[in-house]
Every structure is written in structure tokens, then in C-alpha cells.
């Protein structure tokens, strides 16, 4: 038995043991309450970073806690394994994406094991495997059959040199291709969409069903969905039998329309453009095509536009207004057209001033008919002017009347619109789930039959980063027969957005090896919704929104019976590292090259800026988790991550605090080992449990009772129990636990004899030192449990355990079984946080079974009751000393005890007491003359 704490060897030992025992296997439904603890699964980049460590440590503590609290726990892990980096590796290094990905998974899985996470690896999924994406494809077909998957033209990022589609992350800040350097263009392609807008209202309303989510996340989702109530209005085009449809939240301003704007990509743009304006319009469209969506909609960027020469009619006043195109109007958003009301919209006002367009006031703050020249847009409500039959009305009233007029006259109708757009899921990439559609010249888009799933990714693929998608180049793979009519047809060559893979993985985990169906609904309905989901705030919108959408669609398809996938959400903060930056050159300097006491650039001597930022390779401020574990062990890394900051706040890395947690674990190790050094295991058991199996056999009690008591002897700690509670109370408690029936009267009688014998042998009051220790223990149980069962304030829970260790270090009853119980309780409280050291000490102390399968300690309020308190004695307000008095003593008793004390006798001798002030439980002050 090594007396020195050696974390690396201990951790390796127990990780091997837990794996061999399959200790973290998910239990079957055994009538225990369930708890589904889930971290957002990682992309297999090959190495864990500290952000991963924080995320998964938080979830692991919760999972371990819930097991100890009597829950059956599902704590799985998998890999969000499709994505662009694997394809880039194939292009740059000639490594097949599958090989690169699977090697990274193997490496990261080993790193996760080294951190001691209690993951059920039998539930592992990887989204890039045919076994998984077969069901991703099947789910796509469920959407297709429900009318929720469709194709339409949409803009993509196009590299004109490499002749290929680029993902947003492949376009730099200047709008250039990451590989060729070409200015990226916008190009229209026919692509697949999911009709998430059909669920917009549900997605918005059901946020109210998520009280366990952070309010800011719900607000972000609500804003992203962006519900707007207004009107759809149509403006006839002069000289054409077509109309321009617009949506507005301010139909009360329609009489102030002075122009209409189309998106450059709008199908009507070419039709309304006059010959005189054709070159101007085409040139402008080409310029806009080179801009990203972010560039076009940036608020700090001047809005640009050109007139088409066409005109539209405002149906409310029959006035002709010019039709423009502008960069800030996007075809994919709303109707792809807006009505310009410069007097009452900030953006329209700026645009009108820039291009000298009319500005017509139709709402004023009062009924003064004030039509003065505006210096800025008036966007508030007010009184209608210059608005025909609505003049003089409140704009809030006129809004409804104008919608009714539009509906009566056929100009439009009331409408609810959402900022949320349908989800573009097509990707012109190889490393993703193939879309299971075959395009037939006769039948159109035909779903691949279920029996032909999965549509597997071909392995012999050339990756150049140029030209069409790699799949589109494989004629043998592309050319197939139509499943419906047998005509020569072609496979869909787009793959799915990787967000689709992560939108349903949490549903696969409970039934991860099912080969017959996407999942067994009975199993999924048992485990879902996820009880605690943990992940970064960066996923607050897309991933979480898409997962909610998927759950609702699959519910409507009869596959599950719950509305929301994640009952509680914890968004952990970032892990930040100390960052050094040269303000002169703008370069980041590796922290290893800097003297923290005098931070200067080692090359130039410039004084460096010092601040904390999210850890990243580019800023040279990252800390490798493997290095920390090699030096201090996984338990220390976990403890630091949990202690340094509340989970929802950003965490600043601090080597000194890492060392502080290492010292704390060393202290716990030393305390237990010192106790064991002075007590043999047999003596410890006799003292700690107070009764042995030999004692029971000698007294000839029933075999059933012997079995039950010895099996649960550690849980009862009978000696300590009967020192604190009456035998009758203990008897009732044990009867309740074993649920004895009336037919077991003999057993109950024997049990009473056992307890009476223990009382006679080990009875007696606890000493003051023992009471103090017991009070410290149960205060820690109370505080740690509340910290973990509430908002998961791990940092304060660790602080409470450190307080308990300090109290035990100062205790004067280290030979007492109460002290032994206290050490055991400390290990139990610490177990979810530092699983390896607690398991080792638990076993060394002679306990049976794993510390992680032991019941969580229960708080006893009686233990906090104080028998005596310290009473301060003052003379004329000056403290002269303290005495111990009964905690429940009344004022008269306190005064009496204070008067009789040696302190009072000494300081009051020969003095007249004018007044006595008694503050219960605090002090007695003698006012003397």
C-alpha cells in the first residue's frame, strides 16, 4: 500500500478495473427513476481541448451523483463525425476521410477514458458510419413523405476559379476563397430544404415548456424565430399582369410608400427592368453576387441600389411608385421585396435621402397635420395624415382597418410572418450523409426504397478541391435505374448538412445497436426527454432549434410521444487562457516565451498586452489537458475545472489554482492514510461498524437477520446510530428499509435484541469533539447536496468539501468511529468530482463494492442542533471573555450563568451593576457605575 498519492498509477488502475467490470453500463428499467445525462457530442478533431474537458466533467459529475442518489442513469457519448475538416485532410494530405476520422475517434476516446468519465461505451454512435447514417437517410425520407423536404433555387458561395461551391467557413473576411483566393460569387443552385417554418409557431410557443433552460437561450431562439404580425400586400406592376407581394408589420404606413424594392435575385427583376436600365441593373446584380449575405445586411454599411425603370401601383391611393433593386433585400427572406416608407422606417429614410426619393409623412405624433420636413424617420405610433379615409384616426386603430380594406378589395390580407427561414440542408460535399433521392426524367424526385438504405458513400474518390462535388464525378455511382419505373436515372449528389446528424443523435443513444429500426419507441419514450443537457452557448440557436424541430416532426410521425428533447439545459462558459499580444505588431506571443512578471516580446522588447481570451492555437494560449493529467492527474484537472468558476461563467486558467486542488487531494489522501496507519482493518471495522458477523453468530440470531445486517452494515453504521438515537427509532427505520411483514415477527424480535445489545456494549453520549465532527459532516452533506441538486454550483460544493477536510484535520477525536464515518462521508461527497482517488481510498479502507455505487449520504437535521453555544461577557461594552452555555437557555438563565462566571466575578468585584443587557445566543453586557 503506497503511502504517497500517485495519481497516474491510481487512475490507470481504476480505469482498467471499471472497463473490465463494465461498471458504467446503462441499467435496464428496474423501476428506479431514470436520469438521462448528456453532453453535446464532439467533432473528432483528434485531440480534446479544455472546453471539452469542462463540458464532459460537468456532465460526468451529474451522472455519478444521480447514480448514487438511486437513479438508473444513461450517460452516453458519440461523435459528430461528418464535416469539412476530414475532406480537407483528404485534399491536403491524401488521407481518406473515413480513415482520418476513425483514427481521430480512437485517439479522443482514449483521452476521454483517461479523464475517468463514467460513459456507457456500449451506446457509442458515430454519425459517419453506415449503421448511423442509414437512419439519418431514413429520417430524411420521413420528412420527404410528410411534405417537409423539398427543392428550390437558392444562392451558394461560388469559387469562379476552382469552379466549386464553398461553405461559409471557407470564405475569409474579405469574401475570398480560402484555397484559390478568388473573390467569391453568389450563384443560384437547385437545393434541398426542410420546411421548418411549418413548425415556427410550435417552436416559439413551446419555449414556455422549458423552465429548465436559461432565459437568454430561450430569448435567442425566440428572436431567431422572429414572429411578426402584419399584412401581406400586393402592388400591381404597371404594364404587366403581375404583382409584387410584400410583407409589412406597419400597414398603417402604406399611404407613405414612395418606392418598392426587389431583391436583385428576384425573378421579377428581369421582367420589370426597362431596356434603358438593363446594363445598369445587370452590372449591379453582378456586383451584389460577389457579396456575402452578412456584407449585404450589415447595419454599418451604406445601402446600395439602382432603379429598374419599372413602376408599380400603390392600390390604396392608385399612385405610381418606382421599382428599385437593392443589396439589403434578400430573396430568401420574406417575399424578397419590401415597400419603401422613408418617413417611418430608419433604413428606408437613409436609402431615400441617399437617392433623393420622395419622403411622405403619413403619421404624426398628434392631430396637428404636421407635414414639416423630417430630419429623421418617425417610427412611433400616432395619428394618421395624408392617408385618405383614415386621416385623423389613431394609427393603432387604422392598422386593423387597413388590413380589412385590403382583404375586402383584394389588395392583400393579414399575415403572421417569421424571421425563421426554411432550412437549407444541401451540401456540395463528399463527407456527409448522401441524400437518398434518385432523379428520374419521368417520375421526378424518387425516394430510395427503405430496403436499399443506406446509400453508402463510395470509397474510391478523388479529392481535388476543384470542380463539382466528388460524388458528382463518379458516374458508376451516380447512374442508376429509377426505383419506380426502371428508367435510367441519376442519384442526388448533394450530401446533408451535418446539423441533421446532430439533430437526432440523442434519440439513437438509448437504442444504439438496433439494426431493425431507427429506435424502439418504447425504449426512447422511457428515457427521453434528456434530463440534463450540457453544451456551449454557441449552440443556443441552430443545433438546439433543429433538435426541437426534429423531435416534433418525429412525434407527429408517431415515433415518440414527447414534445421537447431536452428538459434542462446548462450552457457552460468558455475556458480562457492568459493571452499575450504585441500591440505594435498585432502578433500573439506564446505564453511559454514570456516572463509573466515582466511580459515583453522576446524578439522586439515591446511591452505586451495581457488579457484572457478563449483558448485557441492561433493565440498560443491553450493548455493541453494531457499535459495537466501527466503532471497532476485527471482528478486534479476535474477538480480545478469544477472549482474555478460557476459552470455558466467563463473560466480563466490559473496554474496556481490547479496546484491548489492537487494539494487538497493530497490532504484527503494523507488524512485517510494517517487514520489507517493507526487502526488495523479489523479494529476499524469493529469500531466503525460496532458489530461483526462473529458477534451475531455467537448470539445465535436468525440467519436472515445476520445476512441482512452484515450486508448493510456499512450503510447503517449501527454503533454510531444507537449512540445518537433511541433503539426504538432505529428499529422503526430499519423495519421501513427492509419492509418486514407481520409474519416476520421473530426477525423483528431478534432485531430488537441486536440493537439493545449494541446499545449496552457501545452506548453512551457523544463527546463534544464527536458532536462537532458530526455537525461539520452533516453541514457538508446539506450544503453539497443543495449545491448539486439546485443549479449545479460545483465550485461552492468543492469549497464545502474543503471546509469539511479542514474541520476533520482540526478534530481531536481521530480515534473515534464518528471520525471514521466522517472520512467515509468525505469520500462519498468527493466521489463524483474525483472518482479515482475516492475509489482507491474507499477500497483501502476495507469497504465492499465501489464508492460510486454506494448511496449518497443523507442529511440529518438533528446533527446540526447545537447543545452549547459560546456566550460573550462584556463589561460596559468591552469584551472580557466567553463562557459555554446551553443553546436553548432563556434570558434569565443567561444572565444568571454570566453573573456566576469567573469572568464576571473578577471584573464586577466592588462595582454596582446599573443595567444588564442580554442578547440571546450572543452576549451579556453588564453596565456598571
UniProtKB/Swiss-Prot annotation:
ATP-binding recorded as keyword: yes
A Pfam family of the record is Anticodon_1
Q: Which domain of life is it from?
A: Bacteria
Indicate the principal place this protein occupies in or around the cell: cytoplasm
Q: Where is this motif: 'KMSKS' region?
A: 614-618
Alphabetized, the UniProt keywords read: Aminoacyl-tRNA synthetase, ATP-binding, Cytoplasm, Ligase, Nucleotide-binding, Protein biosynthesis
**Motif 'HIGH' region boundaries:** 42-52
Residues that bind ATP, according to the entry? Answer: 617
Q: Where in the cell is it found?
A: Cytoplasm
Q: Which InterPro entries match?
A: aa-tRNA-synth_I_CS, aa-tRNA-synth_Ia, Leu-tRNA-ligase, Leu_tRNA-synth_edit, M/V/L/I-tRNA-synth_anticd-bd, Methionyl/Leucyl_tRNA_Synth, Rossmann-like_a/b/a_fold, tRNAsynth_Ia_anticodon-bd
PROSITE patterns, per the entry: AA_TRNA_LIGASE_I (PS00178)
Q: Which GO terms describe its cellular component?
A: cytosol
Q: What is its EC number?
A: 6.1.1.4
Q: Which reaction does it catalyse?
A: tRNA(Leu) + L-leucine + ATP = L-leucyl-tRNA(Leu) + AMP + diphosphate
Molecular function terms from GO: aminoacyl-tRNA deacylase activity; ATP binding; leucine-tRNA ligase activity
According to its UniProt entry, the protein's GO biological process terms are: leucyl-tRNA aminoacylation
Q: Which family does it belong to?
A: Belongs to the class-I aminoacyl-tRNA synthetase family.
Q: Which NCBIfam families match?
A: leuS_bact
What is the name of the protein in this document?
Leucine--tRNA ligase
Species this protein is from: Trichodesmium erythraeum (strain IMS101)
Q: Gene name?
A: leuS
Amino acid at each position: 500500500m503506497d503511502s504517497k498519492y500517485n495519481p497516474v498509477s491510481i487512475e490507470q488502475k481504476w480505469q482498467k478495473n471499471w472497463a473490465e467490470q463494465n461498471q458504467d453500463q446503462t441499467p435496464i428499467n428496474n423501476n428506479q427513476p431514470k436520469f438521462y445525462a448528456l453532453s453535446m457530442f464532439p467533432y473528432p478533431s483528434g485531440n480534446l481541448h479544455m472546453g471539452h474537458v469542462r463540458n464532459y466533467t460537468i456532465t460526468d459529475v451529474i451522472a455519478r451523483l444521480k447514480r448514487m442518489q438511486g437513479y438508473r442513469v444513461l450517460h452516453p457519448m458519440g461523435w459528430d463525425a461528418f464535416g469539412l475538416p476530414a475532406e480537407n485532410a483528404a485534399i491536403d494530405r491524401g488521407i481518406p476521410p473515413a480513415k482520418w476520422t476513425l483514427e481521430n475517434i480512437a485517439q479522443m476516446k482514449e483521452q476521454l477514458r483517461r479523464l475517468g468519465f463514467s460513459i456507457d461505451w456500449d451506446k457509442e454512435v458515430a454519425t459517419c458510419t453506415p449503421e448511423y447514417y442509414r437512419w439519418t437517410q431514413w429520417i430524411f425520407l420521413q420528412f420527404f413523405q410528410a411534405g417537409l423536404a423539398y427543392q428550390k433555387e437558392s444562392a451558394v458561395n461560388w469559387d469562379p476559379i476552382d469552379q466549386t461551391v464553398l461553405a461559409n467557413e471557407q470564405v475569409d473576411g474579405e469574401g475570398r476563397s480560402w484555397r484559390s483566393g478568388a473573390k467569391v460569387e453568389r450563384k443560384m443552385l437547385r437545393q434541398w430544404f426542410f420546411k421548418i417554418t411549418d413548425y415556427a409557431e410550435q417552436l416559439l410557443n413551446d419555449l414556455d415548456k422549458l423552465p429548465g433552460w436559461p432565459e437568454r437561450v430561450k430569448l435567442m431562439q425566440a428572436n431567431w424565430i422572429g414572429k411578426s404580425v402584419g399584412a401581406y400586400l400586393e402592388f400591381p406592376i404597371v404594364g404587366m399582369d403581375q404583382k409584387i407581394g410584400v410583407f409589412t408589420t406597419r400597414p398603417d404606413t402604406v399611404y407613405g410608400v414612395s418606392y418598392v424594392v426587389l431583391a436583385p435575385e428576384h425573378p421579377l427583376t428581369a421582367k420589370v427592368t426597362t431596356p434603358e436600365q438593363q446594363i445598369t441593373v445587370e452590372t449591379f446584380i453582378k456586383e451584389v453576387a460577389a457579396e456575402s449575405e452578412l456584407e449585404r445586411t450589415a447595419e454599418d454599411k451604406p445601402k446600395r441600389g439602382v432603379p429598374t425603370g419599372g413602376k408599380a401601383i400603390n392600390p390604396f391611393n392608385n399612385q405610381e411608385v418606382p421599382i428599385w433593386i437593392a443589396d439589403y433585400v434578400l430573396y430568401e427572406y420574406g417575399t424578397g421585396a419590401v415597400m419603401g416608407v422613408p418617413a417611418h422606417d430608419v433604413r428606408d429614410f437613409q436609402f431615400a435621402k441617399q437617392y433623393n426619393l420622395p419622403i411622405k409623412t403619413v403619421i404624426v405624433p398628434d392631430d396637428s397635420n404636421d407635414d414639416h420636413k423630417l430630419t429623421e424617420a418617425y417610427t412611433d405610433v400616432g395619428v394618421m395624415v395624408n392617408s385618405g379615409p383614415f386621416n385623423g384616426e389613431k394609427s393603432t386603430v387604422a392598422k386593423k382597418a387597413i388590413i380589412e380594406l385590403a382583404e375586402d378589395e383584394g389588395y392583400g390580407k393579414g399575415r403572421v410572418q417569421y424571421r425563421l427561414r426554411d432550412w437549407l440542408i444541401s451540401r456540395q460535399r463528399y463527407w456527409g450523409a448522401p441524400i437518398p433521392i434518385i432523379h428520374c426524367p419521368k417520375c421526378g424526385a424518387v425516394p430510395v426504397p427503405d430496403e436499399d438504405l443506406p446509400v453508402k458513400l463510395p470509397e474510391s474518390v478523388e479529392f481535388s478541391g476543384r470542380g463539382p462535388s466528388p460524388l458528382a464525378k463518379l458516374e458508376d455511382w451516380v447512374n442508376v435505374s429509377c426505383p419506380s419505373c426502371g428508367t435510367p436515372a441519376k442519384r442526388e449528389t448533394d450530401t446533408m448538412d451535418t446539423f441533421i446528424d446532430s439533430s437526432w443523435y440523442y434519440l439513437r443513444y438509448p437504442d444504439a445497436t438496433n439494426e431493425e429500426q431507427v429506435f424502439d419507441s418504447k425504449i426512447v419514450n422511457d428515457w427521453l426527454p434528456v434530463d440534463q443537457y450540457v453544451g456551449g452557448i454557441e449552440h443556443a440557436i441552430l443545433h438546439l432549434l433543429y433538435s426541437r424541430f426534429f423531435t416534433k416532426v418525429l412525434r407527429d410521425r408517431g415515433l415518440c410521444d414527447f414534445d421537447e428533447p431536452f428538459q434542462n439545459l446548462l450552457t457552460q462558459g468558455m475556458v480562457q487562457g492568459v493571452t499575450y499580444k504585441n500591440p505594435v505588431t498585432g502578433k500573439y506571443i506564446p505564453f511559454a516565451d514570456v516572463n509573466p512578471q515582466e511580459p515583453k516580446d522576446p524578439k522586439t522588447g515591446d511591452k505586451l498586452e495581457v488579457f484572457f481570451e478563449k483558448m485557441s492555437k492561433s493565440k498560443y494560449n491553450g493548455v493541453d489537458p494531457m499535459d495537466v493529467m501527466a503532471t497532476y492527474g485527471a482528478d486534479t484537472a476535474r477538480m480545478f475545472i469544477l472549482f474555478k468558476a460557476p459552470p455558466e461563467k467563463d473560466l480563466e486558467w490559473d496554474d496556481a489554482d490547479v496546484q491548489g486542488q492537487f494539494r487538497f487531494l493530497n490532504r484527503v489522501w494523507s488524512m485517510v492514510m494517517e487514520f489507517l496507519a493507526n487502526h488495523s482493518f479489523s479494529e476499524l471495522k469493529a469500531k466503525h461498524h460496532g458489530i461483526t458477523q462473529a458477534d451475531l453468530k455467537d448470539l445465535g440470531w436468525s440467519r436472515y437477520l445476520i445476512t441482512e445486517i452484515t450486508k448493510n452494515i456499512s450503510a447503517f453504521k449501527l454503533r454510531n446510530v444507537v449512540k445518537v438515537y433511541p433503539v426504538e427509532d432505529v428499529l422503526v427505520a430499519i423495519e421501513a428499509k427492509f419492509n418486514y411483514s407481520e409474519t416476520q415477527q421473530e426477525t423483528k424480535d431478534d432485531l430488537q435484541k441486536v440493537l439493545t445489545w449494541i446499545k449496552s456494549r457501545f452506548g453512551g453520549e457523544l463527546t463534544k469533539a464527536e458532536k462537532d465532527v458530526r455537525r461539520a459532516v452533516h453541514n457538508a452533506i446539506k450544503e453539497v447536496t443543495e449545491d448539486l441538486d439546485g443549479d449545479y454550483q460545483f465550485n461552492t460544493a468543492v469549497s464545502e468539501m474543503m471546509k469539511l477536510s479542514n474541520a476533520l484535520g482540526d478534530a481531536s477525536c481521530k480515534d473515534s468511529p464518528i471520525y471514521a464515518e466522517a472520512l467515509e462521508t468525505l469520500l462519498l461527497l468527493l466521489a463524483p468530482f474525483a472518482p479515482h482517488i475516492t475509489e482507491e481510498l474507499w477500497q483501502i479502507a476495507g469497504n465492499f463494492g465501489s464508492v460510486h455505487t454506494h448511496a449518497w449520504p443523507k442529511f440529518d437535521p438533528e446533527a446540526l442542533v447545537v447543545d452549547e453555544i459560546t456566550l460573550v461577557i462584556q463589561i460596559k461594552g468591552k469584551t472580557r471573555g466567553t463562557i459555554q452555555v446551553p443553546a436553548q437557555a432563556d434570558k434569565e438563565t443567561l444572565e444568571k450563568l454570566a453573573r456566576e462566571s469567573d469572568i464576571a466575578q473578577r471584573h464586577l468585584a466592588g462595582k454596582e451593576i446599573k443595567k444588564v443587557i442580554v442578547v440571546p445566543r450572543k452576549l451579556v453586557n453588564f453596565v456598571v457605575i
